[in-house]
Amino acid sequence: TYGYAVLVSDETESYYYTSHLEAKVSAKTHEIIKIQRSVIGSFAAMIEARDGITGLHIKNTSNFVKILTHAMQNSPKYADRITDDYAQMVSAAAKLHDIGKIAVPDYVLQKPGKLTDEEYEIMKKHPAEGARIIKETLGKLENDEYVHIAYNMAYYHHEKFAGGGYPCNLKGTEIPLSARIMAIC
């Protein structure tokens, strides 16, 4: 009978140890997510510091994305694709869609009037630059799905459903859903 007592004791210790480790991993995961969101907020603040209009645009679009994804969740067409987690990631990633504007020179970004053709070509590079920044800075920090969503939103948010957008001239469902949502907002 002593053998059973030792076995039960070992199993109980193992269970509590495993539970303790799982709790620690969960706490660290939440801490990492908190840090990542702080980094994202810092990126958004950097954009806002360079261009006050873009900063206000970032806050508004993030709120609009949240409203739109919530409405889409109630639509039979998108209910299975837009989970609560997806909606939350798209809303958070919306803050980064214009991060590539950090690489746009001030004379273009802050120009009060219409851009020349040359300046417009410079401005059109911000989606690709934003996607690159997201991949390089968040690729090792954030979960793969979030990085994929943020990358797509930054890279494709100027594509048009009917075609004629940039940088890839995609159309319709060739454009990732997250980028289509961003383009509306």
Say what each PLM segment does.
Residues 34-185:
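Histidine- and acidic-residue-rich, metal-dependent catalytic cores
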Residues 2-32:
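Sensory coupling linkers of modular signal transduction proteins
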